């Protein structure tokens, strides 16, 4: 999603 991009980077 929009802000989810950052979360994906952490994963």
Curated annotation (Swiss-Prot):
Key word Secreted present: yes
Cell compartment(s), UniProt: Secreted
Post-translational modification Arginine amide, affected residues: 11
Transmembrane portions of the chain: none
Primary role: Myoactive peptide.
GO BP terms, alphabetized: neuropeptide signaling pathway
Keywords: Amidation, Neuropeptide, Secreted
Organism: Calliphora vomitoria (Blue bottle fly)
Single GO cellular component term: extracellular region
Chief location: secreted
Superkingdom of the source species: Eukaryota
Name assigned to this protein: Callitachykinin-2
């Amino acid at each position: 999603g929009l802000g989810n991009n950052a979360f994906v980077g952490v994963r």
